[in-house]
Amino acid sequence: MGRTLESKQQIVEELKKLLGEAEMALVLDYQGLSIKEMSDLRTRLQASNGVCKVTKNTLMRRAIDGDSVWSSLDSLLNGTNAFVLIKGDVGGAVKAVQSFQKETKKSETKGGLFEGKLLSQDEIKAIGELPSKEVLMAQIAGAINAVTTKVAVGVNEVPSGLARALKQHADSGES
């Protein structure tokens, strides 16, 4: 039995809400994936605030209709699609999808959309290879710490150098 008009409108409204909160969307070909595998993907995405939705392309088309940010997704809406909508940790969610695809070898990323720009598979792969937010913060903290250490050593070296020069001058004056 098909869905009623009211249930379709609810789905479109839910998709609009999710798109309004999302920073990035990925379109996956989910053909051949079992329910268990889809559940596994959804579980992996939860850690990075990602949601995986399987819906008809027509309903997604209605959800993005008139929305300038998401309208470019229209070109990817053909075939059997699952939509990964990500808010928050974009890199972590892309990594989760990529590791899932590597393990199952059944799903393929058709493309994605980030900040209104349509992304190719290569661009999505590049996002997945970026370090996580935590790693970047640790690298920045390490770099800042290294600079302060070098400044402290440099500041400490000025009086030490002066003291050595005075001692050397005093020693040369005694002989």
From Swiss-Prot:
It holds the Pfam family Ribosomal_L10. GO terms for biological process: translation. The keyword RNA-binding applies. InterPro entries: Ribosomal_uL10, Ribosomal_uL10-like_sf, Ribosomal_uL10_bac, Ribosomal_uL10_bac_type. One of its GO terms (cellular component) is ribosome. Keywords: Ribonucleoprotein, Ribosomal protein, RNA-binding, rRNA-binding. It comes from the Bacteria. One of its GO terms (molecular function) is large ribosomal subunit rRNA binding. CDD domains: Ribosomal_L10 (cd05797). Forms part of the ribosomal stalk, playing a central role in the interaction of the ribosome with GTP-bound translation factors. PANTHER family: 39S RIBOSOMAL PROTEIN L10, MITOCHONDRIAL. Belongs to the universal ribosomal protein uL10 family. NCBIfam families: PRK00099.1-1. Part of the ribosomal stalk of the 50S ribosomal subunit. The N-terminus interacts with L11 and the large rRNA to form the base of the stalk. The C-terminus forms an elongated spine to which L12 dimers bind in a sequential fashion forming a multimeric L10(L12)X complex. This is Large ribosomal subunit protein uL10. It comes from Synechococcus sp. (strain CC9311).
